[in-house]
Amino acid sequence: MKELAKQYDPSQVEDRIYQFWQDGGYFHTEADPDKKPYTIVMPPPNVTGQLHMGHALDNTMQDVLIRTKRMQGYAALWVPGTDHASIATEAKVVEAMRAEGLTKEMVGRDGFLERAWDWKTKYGNRIVSQLKKLGTSCDWQRERFTMDEGCSDAVKEVFVHLYDKGLIYRGNRMVNWCPHCNTSISDAEVEYEEKGGNFWHLLYPVKETGEMLELATTRPETMLGDTAVAINGEDPRYAHLHGCHVVLPLLNKEIPIVCDEHADMTKGTGVVKITPAHDPNDFEVGLRHDLPIVRVFTYDGHMTGAADKAAADALFAAGKNTVNEPEVLDCGKYAGMTTLEARKAILADLKEGGFLKEIEPLKHEVGTCYRCHSTIEPMVSKQWFVKMEPLAKPAIESVEKGEIKFVPERFTKNYLNWMKGTRDWCISRQLWWGHQIPAFYCDDCGETVVAKEMPCTCPKCGGSHFTQDPDTLDTWFSSALWPFSTLGWPNEDSADLKYFYPTNTLVTGYDIIGFWVSRMIFSGLAYTGKAPFDTVCIHGIVRDSQGRKMSKSLGNGIDPLEVIAQYGADALRFMLLDGSTPGNDMRYSEKKVEAARNFANKLWNATRFVLMNLPEDFQPGLPEESKLDMSDKWVLTKLNQVAGAMTDNLDHFEMGLAAAKINSFIWDVYCDWFIEIAKPRLNSGNAEQADTARRVLVYVLDKALKLLHPFMPFITEELYQALPGSAETIMTQSWPTFDEAHNWAEEEEAFEKVMDYIKAVRTMRTEMNVHPAKKTSMIIETADPAPFRNAEVYLAKFAFATDVTFTEKYEGSTDGMVQVSTHTARGFIPMMELIDREKELARLNKEKAKAEKELAMFENQLANPKFVERAPAALVEEIRAKRTNSQSKLANIEQSIKALG
């Protein structure tokens, strides 16, 4: 038998155990016709990222599921991988180049990509090694990257397929533009923050009447791009202005007054300025009224100037402009200013000209980039889009029919709301790192050819020279294909794809249901004809101890690797799961980590005790039932119940409940009770009794380690290998299940009667400060003495009884006796010679006063007819039960006071 160290040191165990698992190939899975598959694909963390608490929670949950299914006999595959993270990675590389005095343009696209791949190689393995520290049992032989050859092939296949079906198109549309990242981003990537601002009330003169039209805007710098003012056609206040014009202040330019329902008669003055190039609603108004689209911002957040206008004019002159192509304004004195600088200058000029009426402070939601948190500029830009309506419909139906379930179910609504409200998806990004769009433009005639590879001949003019579109695809485009691109698609003959797809469970946070979950669902249905998974298990975020979101700005982030270094990975994993509930946020608690570490130490010490009491020739296995005593059947029944309950919990993704159950069983049932109960038999001198106790101790420990293994894999592996008769690894052992043969309900109930009585006696002795060495006789009054008679050895050991008398009704003298009561027994214990009488009387009188106050409170509640009539019936019954308990408690205290004279 393996000898365990005196104390558990995770730093001496975890790396060695993980290497043992990897060397043994225990994480690797192949298609097996004799087994059912169970597949999880890891949400790929950013290749430049590092492990944070969200990763730790997400991957611990996945590991619990995959380890459990592996032990349940499934061909359990967990596919790991990383995401190329276009925006984040490009920003990192650009920042590193800036430190060298270089820009992207200086080194060129090829030079930049070479640096980006070097960066990926240097930092890409960091988060993988950190995930291994956590104990993740991924099939690392199948590790994937969203820009590896297989994923790239899948991306091209999908793009060409969608384009050929008319579901991908290129056009000038309103997009969310990040001036810092210098790229468009999708609606899902815009985060909204409440910020302070103003409504600036401006006055626009009407050309035909000379009157002033008042309107309000939060962005006065956009007024240079106004191409109309809108009123509601039903608004009687402005009926006389139909067909009129206003003169745009500062530019002295005539623009029309249009009638459009976008102008709400009930809000403000009912007049709105229309800037089609820089507002999504205004863009739609512009399309309805065929208004010019005039861009006044550059892509890096400055006001446009003469050079910008000249470039745009040249495009129009050459006939290369496309539908909805924006004109560009030379903003004159404001050209080159940042948008905020221009705002100040424009407002000053408006005020000077008498066009600024008033300023109204307000709080409003401002769109920001999810990566850099810069303010998003709505911008009309030529981009690639996916038509969402045809793809969204089957994805909505699949969830509504129950083919895909969300856990908790409430997140189904989030998903459906997102899918039903989604607009066409802008998939092009003005970046170099990522999947370059497989669209090629003929250098001779400008024809667009979409193909997986560079075409040889132009189908329109026969030319042979092409330029590939410089933009890359949204990172989420490739991530949307992750469940099947990682399993061999588009090769539909792939053995892995046939066996492991569709996958089973997706574990992810609620914050990326729109970003990622929705896109995987419609992609799986569109390209494979199957939903990519059947269950989406949603978890919350890990907050700090005060309930705040962890962030760099608050400085409240907790590094999981530091926690692992101090407490071990098992302690961190258990803290994250114990008591957690699906879909809800949780708080990081160092006290809970310490408690998990203490739990590991408790288990270690218990295992050492068991091993130290085994002879060299010990052979594991339960003895025949006739040799089991009441306590053996009790602990085996408890183990059986826990195995059944945990299996049910895990089937329903209630990992927190499952963790709490095995914690309670090992600590409370096995360590605090059964080991202590076994000691008298181990030391009894009776070889058969000692052997039975040993066998039950080892059997229960073996099963408990297996139940705990998915949650705390390192310590359970180390302890399991120390048990006599253990196999090579706990990972591949069978998961314990409910066994009717080990369900002794009567013995369980009987033994718990004894336990309750022992607990009551020990509590009483503790309260009365009686030393454990002081023992006394006792009389037990009970209608069912059999369990107590069968447990006299335990009453002597744990209730400190010298001898026990049993009676159905005790009618003797109670002088000098203290009473203890449970729901099935009452004990009369002579305590006078063991205690300080005066001190005990003082304590009892204090307890009596407390009990009387408690009873009075319950009686007052029940004496109030309004409470009894209006309160929920269950609450009234609960108060009545508490009153009854208080009455019984008070009676026992009074009896004890009387006994002490």
Q: What is each residue range found by the language model?
A:
Residues 1-234, 275-288, 292-311, 343, ...:
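N-terminal, positively charged nucleic-acid-binding surface of large information/translation enzymes
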Residues 34-42, 64, 100-103, 128-135, ...:
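Active-site-adjacent bridging/hinge elements
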Residues 37-43, 49, 273-274, 443-445, ...:
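Short hydrophobic beta-strand segments
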Residues 54-66, 73, 82-83, 151-154, ...:
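Structured ligand/cofactor/substrate-binding pocket environments in proteins
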Residues 67-75, 96-109, 129, 133-138, ...:
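Secondary-structure transition/capping motifs at alpha-helix termini
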Residues 181, 251, 372, 443-445, ...:
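Short Cys/His-rich metal-coordination motifs, predominantly Zn2+-binding knuckles/fingers
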Residues 201, 417-477, 481, 526-569, ...:
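Feature 926 captures the class I aminoacyl-tRNA synthetase adenylation module centered on the KMSKS loop
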Residues 391-409, 497-499, 853:
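Residues forming anionic-ligand binding surfaces in small-molecule and nucleic-acid pockets
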